[in-house]
């Protein structure tokens, strides 16, 4: 890191404060030991299901695969009390097929990764054109990636300016800003990137942990750093920012631990799919299995539930 970058980081941390890493780890360790009563557990499982962005982001995606994903999103279970998921998440080229499969006013939104996902390594003009194309084809939400190289070089104004340009390109579509926490490496960097994004986002736009394409994705630790940043930003500005951990959350047990973290850090106002999401696919089937177990007392075999894509 250059001397200029060091100076930029020092100035930012003087504004927002560093992360207490020991405190973060102590807090997240407690979330894993919480016991949940039966009624609360069933509520939490259904809530988590309603927060899923059901995702397929593979090179072998086809219109037929996306249509199947959309059917899973609309009808995750034969149990009428199980909610639909929050959204499906697909590549920009698949948005029109998702819109065709979902129709209008179903309650399931269409999210699309854009801005040269997952690397972000394309000219800004190209990235913005991809955003506009996805929105024109029917995307309700855009998941963008930040310029990690610029961030790590201390070029914070460039990072913010690019996010602000994507906000404008989104129009009325919700924006989710992916930090790619594995490449940021430290909790301090994750907090700093969160603040840079939040300062140019609109109420209920999102910050998001990961693309799901690297070795380290969402953890209770990096989720905690980001939701504490959201809390601090909200207390300072009154602007509510939403959160999406993505990648690596595959079990109902994990999802409930993340929801405990949200409740204890941000409160009940964030316990809805407007302000909290899970970027996942395999998670949904485990949630459905656990819901069935709570309802009937018996586990269903994994093949009982239709398969969604397993890319996250």
Task: Label the model's feature ranges.
Residues 39-49, 60-83, 93-243, 250-281, ...:
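Alpha/beta enzyme core
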Residues 57:
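A short, histidine- and acid-enriched strand-loop-helix "catalytic/donor-clamping" loop
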Residues 1-48:
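Charged, compositionally biased N-terminal leader segments and the immediate start
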Residues 286:
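N-terminal beta-loop-helix "entrance" segment that forms/cooperates
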């Amino acid at each position: 890191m250059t001397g200029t970058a060091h100076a930029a980081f020092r100035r930012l941390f003087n504004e927002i404060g560093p992360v207490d890493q020991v405190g973060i780890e102590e807090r997240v360790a407690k979330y894993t030991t919480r016991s949940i009563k039966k009624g609360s557990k069933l509520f939490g499982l259904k809530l988590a299901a309603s927060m899923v962005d059901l995702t397929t982001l593979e090179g072998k995606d086809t219109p037929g695969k996306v249509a199947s994903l959309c059917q899973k999103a609309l009808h995750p279970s034969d149990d009428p009390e199980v909610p639909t998921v929050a959204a499906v998440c697909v590549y920009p080229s698949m948005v029109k097929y998702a819109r065709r499969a979902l129709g209008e006013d179903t309650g399931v939104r269409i999210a699309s990764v854009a801005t040269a996902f997952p690397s972000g390594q394309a000219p800004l003009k190209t990235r913005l054109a991809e955003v506009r194309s996805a929105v024109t084809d029917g995307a309700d939400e855009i998941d963008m990636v930040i310029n990690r190289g610029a961030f790590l070089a201390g070029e914070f104004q460039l990072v913010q300016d690019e996010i602000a340009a994507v906000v404008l390109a989104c129009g009325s579509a919700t924006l989710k800003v992916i930090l790619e926490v594995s490449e940021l490496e430290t909790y301090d960097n994750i907090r700093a990137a969160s603040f840079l994004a939040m300062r140019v986002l609109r109420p209920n736009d999102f910050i998001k942990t990961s693309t799901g394409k690297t070795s380290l994705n969402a953890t209770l630790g990096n989720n905690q750093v980001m939701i504490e940043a959201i809390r601090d930003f909200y207390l300072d500005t009154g602007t509510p920012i939403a959160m999406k951990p993505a990648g690596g959350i595959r079990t109902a047990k994990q999802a409930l631990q993340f929801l405990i973290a949200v409740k204890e850090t941000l409160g009940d106002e964030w316990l809805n799919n407007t302000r909290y999401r899970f970027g996942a696919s395999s998670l949904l089937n485990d949630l459905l299995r656990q819901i069935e177990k709570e309802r009937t007392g018996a586990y269903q075999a994994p093949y009982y539930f239709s398969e969604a894509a397993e890319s996250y």
